[in-house]
C-alpha cells in the first residue's frame, strides 16, 4: 500500500496525486492539516522538515516532494506500473 501525506493547499501534493490517479495507482491520502499525528509523522520521516508531499511505499522507502519523472520511475522500479 502506498500512503501519501499532503494537504489540499499544496501544489506539489496535487501534482503528485494527479499523476498517481492518471497511472491508476491506489493510495491512502492523509491530510496533515486535519491530522496532527500525521503532521508529526511527516516531520519524523523527513528528519525534522515539514516538507510535503511525503509518499511512503510498500518497501518502506519514501520520497519527499518528488518530481513526476522520479515518482513514476520509483513506481516502475517497484513493479506498481509498467514503463
Kindly give the residue locations of the regions a language model identified.
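Conserved strand-to-helix beginnings and helix N-cap segments that scaffold or border functional pockets
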Residues: 14-17, 39, 68
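Short amphipathic alpha-helix with an adjacent loop that forms part of the alpha/beta core around
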Residues: 40-46, 75
Amino acid at each position: 500500500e502506498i500512503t501519501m501525506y499532503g494537504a489540499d493547499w499544496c501544489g506539489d501534493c496535487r501534482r503528485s496525486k494527479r499523476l498517481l490517479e492518471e497511472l491508476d495507482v491506489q493510495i491512502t491520502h492523509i491530510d496533515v492539516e486535519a491530522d496532527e499525528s500525521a503532521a508529526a509523522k511527516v516531520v519524523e520521516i523527513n528528519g525534522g522538515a515539514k516538507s510535503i508531499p511525503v509518499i511512503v511505499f510498500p518497501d518502506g522507502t519514501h520520497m519527499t516532494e518528488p518530481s513526476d519523472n522520479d515518482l513514476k520511475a520509483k513506481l516502475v522500479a517497484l513493479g506498481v506500473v509498467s514503463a
